[in-house]
């Protein structure tokens, strides 16, 4: 998903937890029901984001969003992982918004700066790919129109 990672957190994010590790997080969450601690929810969300399954990654981002709203003391950590999770699911707009919010709190945070650079690079790459696809589609369309015009002249 990511080329050579700017920093270790991106590389680590690509490695899902083992089934056993994930089961431990889920068991901890279940053992604390009906009101699991914020840290337990955070750990579970982190495990979900590391997953290779898009729905689990989205659920992890959802849990972190809820934690951001309810746990003021965890906002710094939550913003960082919200940004990572959003990046992983391809939601670059929110990924950038979250990391920029973190940089407002901690302007010298090198991890956040590296993450912002990675997000900006992904946005640029995706934009160029989109332009290339649109340009290719336009060329094919113009070619077809040209062929039809030539055919109708005969």
Curated annotation (Swiss-Prot):
It is a single-pass membrane protein. Residues 150-154 are mitochondrial intermembrane. Has a role in mitochondrial fission. Has a role in outer membrane fission but not matrix separation. TPR repeats lie at residues 76-109. Keywords: Membrane, Mitochondrion, Mitochondrion outer membrane, Repeat, TPR repeat, Transmembrane, Transmembrane helix. It is found in: Mitochondrion outer membrane. Residues 1-128 are cytoplasmic. Pfam families: Fis1_TPR_C, Fis1_TPR_N. It comes from the Eukaryota. SUPFAM superfamilies: TPR-like. One of its GO terms (biological process) is mitochondrial fission. Gene3D superfamilies: Tetratricopeptide repeat domain (1.25.40.10). This is Mitochondrial fission 1 protein. The C-terminus is required for mitochondrial localization, while the N-terminus is necessary for mitochondrial fission. InterPro entries: Fis1 (IPR016543), Fis1_cytosol (IPR033745), Fis1_TPR_C (IPR028061), Fis1_TPR_N (IPR028058), TPR-like_helical_dom_sf (IPR011990), TPR_rpt (IPR019734). One of its GO terms (cellular component) is peroxisomal membrane. GO terms for molecular function: lipid binding; molecular adaptor activity. Belongs to the FIS1 family. Its main location: mitochondrion. The chain crosses the membrane at residues 129-149.
């Amino acid at each position: 998903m990511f080329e050579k990672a700017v920093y270790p957190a991106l590389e680590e994010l690509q490695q899902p937890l083992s089934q056993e590790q994930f089961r431990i997080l889920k068991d901890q969450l279940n053992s604390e029901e009906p009101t699991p601690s914020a840290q337990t929810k955070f750990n579970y969300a982190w495990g979900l984001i590391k997953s290779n399954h898009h729905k689990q990654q989205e659920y992890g981002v959802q849990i972190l969003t809820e934690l951001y709203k309810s746990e003021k003391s965890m906002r710094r950590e939550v913003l960082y992982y919200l940004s990572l999770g959003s990046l992983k699911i391809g939601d670059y707009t929110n990924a950038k918004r979250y990391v920029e919010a973190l940089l407002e709190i901690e302007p010298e945070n090198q991890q956040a700066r590296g993450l912002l650079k990675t997000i900006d690079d992904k946005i640029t790459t995706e934009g160029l790919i989109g332009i290339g696809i649109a340009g290719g589609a336009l060329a094919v369309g113009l070619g077809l129109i040209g062929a039809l015009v030539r055919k109708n002249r005969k």
